[in-house]
Structure formats: C-alpha cells, structure tokens
Amino acid sequence: MKHLTEMVRQHKAGKTNGIYAVCSAHPLVLEAAIRYASANQTPLLIEATSNQVDQFGGYTGMTPADFRGFVCQLADSLNFPQDALILGGDHLGPNRWQNLPAAQAMANADDLIKSYVAAGFKKIHLDCSMSCQDDPIPLTDDIVAERAARLAKVAEETCLEHFGEADLEYVIGTEVPVPGGAHETLSELAVTTPDAARATLEAHRHAFEKQGLNAIWPRIIALVVQPGVEFDHTNVIDYQPAKATALSQMVENYETLIFEAHSTDYQTPQSLRQLVIDHFAILKVGPALTFALREALFSLAAIEEELVPAKACSGLRQVLENVMLDRPEYWQSHYHGDGNARRLARGYSYSDRVRYYWPDSQIDDAFAHLVRNLADSPIPLPLISQYLPLQYVKVRSGELQPTPRELIINHIQDILAQYHTACEGQ
C-alpha cells in the first residue's frame, strides 16, 4: 500500500500532511466518504474495528472478507478506483475475548489477523494491551509487545501465502481510554509521556527481533498515543498543543514513524490541523460521521412532520426510541442519570450509541419510509433553511440537489471536509 508509506515519507520530509481514517460500516457514511475522496482525487482509508468485523461476524454480522466485498462493491458502483482504496483493521488482538484465558483469546486473535490479512486489509493495528481472564492488570509493556509480535508474524505469513509478497503496514500501541469515546464524564486527559511512547516502541522492537521480524520495522508506520483529545456524552476535550510538545518532538527522532490519534471526533478544524502539524498525522474519525448522519435524519424527520399527515409519517424517531428501549444492550451501560437524561443521551450523545441500531430492520424500514415521503415532491426551501441551514446555502447556489439522500450525504461530507483540510499539508 504505497499511499500510506508515501504519506509518511512526505510528512517526515516536512510537508505537514496526513490522512484521515473513516471508521464506520454505515452505507451512507461510506458513500459520502467515497464520493468526497473521488471529488478531491485523494486516496481513502476505511477501517473496521475488531468489534465490528471479525472471523465470526462481529456486531455488523460481517467477516473481513464480507466487509471488503461490501466496501469494494460500493466503490465500484461509484467508479472509485480500487487502487485508491486502503482498508485497515483497528484494535486487532484479543479485544473481543478478554473474558477468556489468554491462550484461548490469543488463538482467536491469530485467526482474526489471518482473516483480515487474507481478505486484503493492508493497514493492521496490532493491539494486545487488554488483559484477558487469567492476566495481571495492567499488562506489562513486554507482554503486550510479545503478543503483538506473535500476531505480526501470523500477518506476514498470511500475506505471503495469499499475495506472494509482504506489503502490510502496521500500527502499534493503544490510547487510553477504550475505543469509541469515554464512558464517564471527562474534564482533563493525561497526554502520553515521551518515556511511555519510547518504552512501547523499544518493547515492540525487541519483541519483533525475537520473532525474526527485524525487516518489517520500517513498515511500522505509526504509534497510537493519547495527544489529549477525547469526548464523552456532552463534552469535548480539545487538543492543547502545549501539553503535547514533548511527545510531538520525540517522534521526530524516528525516520519512518508518525503518530496515530484516535477519538479525534468533534475536535475543531483548527485543532485537527494542529494535530497533523504536530505529527499526529493519522486521524481516526467514526462517531462524528454517524452523529452527522443522525443529525440529518432527525432534521428530515422534523421536515416530514411539517409536510406529511401524522398517520402517513415514518415515525422514524419514535421507532428508533422504541427499538433502543427494547434492546438496550448497546447503550445501557454507557448512559446514566434519570429517565430524561438517558432519553436525551439516546438521541443526542456525542458517543452516538444510536449508530449500533441503524441496521435494525424496523429502523431501516422507517428510514426508507421517510426518504419515500420526502422524495415524492420537492422539499420547500424555507424548511431546508430551517432544519439544514448549511445545506440550504449549497442548494440555493445550485451545487446541491435538495433530495433526502443528497442532503444527508452532504451533511456528512461537511465533517469529512474538515478532516480533508486538516490533512492536506503544505
């Protein structure tokens, strides 16, 4: 995957460029991302997490091969070149099997890596930082690195077997807290120290040497660290460059390495740009994209209520609420407080747990019903101005068709545009 290696090379040469990673499996989010990358003639990095997609199907019901097929089919339908598409696997390791003994969890992790690599994923994030059932808490750097090296060996062997060459690119390390947004209310966040980052790198270098993997070190392109960015349900901790200065300077001593920043969702455009300048040059974004999708759908549902008799409405918001109450497993342990606080969180939280519910057949039917209702006749411009004001400006200037799908996709692309600008470089 020359795109990533070339991006890192240019960044290390002073271009202050980067790349964003779209971490979503929602078809409309992916369509928005593919169309945006196509219009801007940039490569597109799409990542699946070990929770979403695994050899058993993950919570999306897709294996890595299924996910690749799904994304490639969508890209083909939109005439996006396959060679500009990069697929990544995020937090690959024993994450899904922490309740099992380490030996069993790591055997599953071996198979997880095989399934991702065999399916053609080229950017592999090795994350063995989580303790399994019979492990100490927390794990030492050495144990984490030994397990990552074991998975790297599996990945290399699988890649050679299936593709005749080893061209994988690796990301190592992890951020704190866990992926997908913090569970608790945040006020400040500890930035990874340079010493901790160096210790992670050295432990991995030593473990890779022991596995005979010295040659792949230049293909370890990024280290995941915590630059001090995070979000909870209603708050965002903004990037403060001064707190990350020492960390940022530390990576300048490694000629083929940059940082990868997770949970960059909801950062300001200025913060996103500064992160890239400060060598956090791979920006992960996921919940902010499905949050934008949800915003657009709620806006269209409000427009529908103004235009369509109640008995003919899709009732999307009520259907969504009913399904979330019937199946609370994706939000119950995340949203706290009284009934009203939990209701607001279900609809509006930055952590966007609602994203797990869009594939539900009842909700999908209501979405299709909403789109049908609003596609029958033109949406009055004053209602677009009221509920989707940013899109209204583009509709009036003639650059955007005011159909439900185009309004949704463009609203998502407003977020992608911030990431594109941050990553463009000088």
UniProtKB/Swiss-Prot annotation:
GO-annotated cellular components: plasma membrane
InterPro entries: Aldolase_TIM, GatZ/KbaZ-like, GatZ_KbaZ_carbometab, TagBP_ald_KbaZ
Metabolic or biological pathway, per its Swiss-Prot or TrEMBL entry: Carbohydrate metabolism; D-tagatose 6-phosphate degradation; D-glyceraldehyde 3-phosphate and glycerone phosphate from D-tagatose 6-phosphate: step 2/2
Pfam families documented for this protein: GatZ_KbaZ-like
Entry superkingdom: Bacteria
GO BP terms: carbohydrate metabolic process; D-tagatose 6-phosphate catabolic process; phosphoenolpyruvate-dependent sugar phosphotransferase system
Listed NCBIfam families: agaZ_gatZ, PRK15458.1
Role played: Component of the tagatose-1,6-bisphosphate aldolase KbaYZ that is required for full activity and stability of the Y subunit. Could have a chaperone-like function for the proper and stable folding of KbaY. When expressed alone, KbaZ does not show any aldolase activity.
Family: Belongs to the GatZ/KbaZ family. KbaZ subfamily.
Subunit record text: Forms a complex with KbaY.
Name of the protein in its database record: D-tagatose-1,6-bisphosphate aldolase subunit KbaZ
